Amino acid sequence: MHPVKRIEIISDSVELGKIVEALEKIGVTSYSIIHNVSSKGIKGTVFDDSAVTMLDNVYVIAFCSPDKAKPVVEEIRPILNKFGGSCWISEVMEIRSVRCIASM
């Protein structure tokens, strides 16, 4: 096991391209994206009641080495400040498995 940073971002789908571009610019190339996210926060509740996918919320989860967390914040913060959204970064432990289950 080794320490990594877990990055979670919720934003409008419209900003997804900018967020992904920022992550990849820093070298965070492994991430998952979940579309049509409903949530509730200090600004109220956001439901997935739109037929237009450009107005949906997305959830991006990525993991990176601890040294990349600060550059991620510097790139993501202006996007979220301008267009809205939330970002959380936490410390987690990664377990790397190099053993193929099929060979067991």
Regions found by a protein language model. Give the residues of each.
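Positively charged, small/polar-rich N-terminal and surface patches that mediate targeting and assembly
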Residues: 1-104
